[in-house]
């Protein structure tokens, strides 16, 4: 069990801004550049449906790539940086953060916060920007909000739970899960509770949102959809009671696209649920533990696909409609984290080999390789790519 962060560390996030907006399911409607020419990657999964996909018709961001620079954060980066209007906000596991202007690597903000226990991480979730405010959740149970421009504290709330679930913000409401089995909806302006839903098991994954519903999955085999305004259940599917599946906990966050909800249990079973009813549309056995979340994309020239890796080192492209494998690539080591799809390339990584690999989304052929690795391997501001290493944020440019 990781030691909880102190309130002092909670306030560290308030100096780190990031960006977001309410966006479509796959990301296709959210890939337009801002007036400055940048595309935002404002939260874990990039869009509220958490598809981990940045569409690009052109191949300007595809390999070959070259390393342009590297910034060391001096500790593990559990979550990728949030990117808003050309600035990346990077926070390591101890709550120490930097705000980096990506075009010239100028550090706009830098935090030097000492952990309450140097042997244990304090910050474990991804921050989110919403309507001028920055929100972040901490393992200690603290949820904090700050002004995105100034870093001034807006509010802090202590929940009686541990938090490993990254917040989500939609329509003035924050959504997150707790280890005390609750899905919470909090008023973004002051952190007060709008509603709570008690699930059968702990919520370790992050909730997702699409078309008026919040989707989550727990550690007691259940996936469910809730009305985002009221918290009332729309559907719930206990996968342990659906033959032939036994018990398995959901550690991965749901991704919503193409009328389906995609999520993986830690026993290696990848599920597709009907978005409206929760009925199991198909399942796929990855052959080993799965801890990462699925990336879902319709890349030009390919059918809608789910991309996910397992502890056995196998990485799969699965047809999102049928659950049949399109191709498989052997990474060479366990895949503990979540893939991302940028343009025509899907990126995955392995801590054991300390390698990040780029694969052609259509064929599975390797097109990129570098000796750096993190949980979520790559993000982008629409102009460049940024590799998330174990300690480093690495800027990559087309050759």
Regions found by a protein language model. Give the residues of each.
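Bacterial N-terminal signal peptides that target proteins for export
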Residues: 1-7
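Bacterial signal peptide processing site
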Residues: 19-22
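Extracytoplasmic beta-rich repeat domains
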Residues: 38, 45, 68-82, 107-130, ...
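Short loop/turn segments that connect beta-strands within beta-propeller blades
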Residues: 101-105, 147-150, 187-191, 227-230, ...
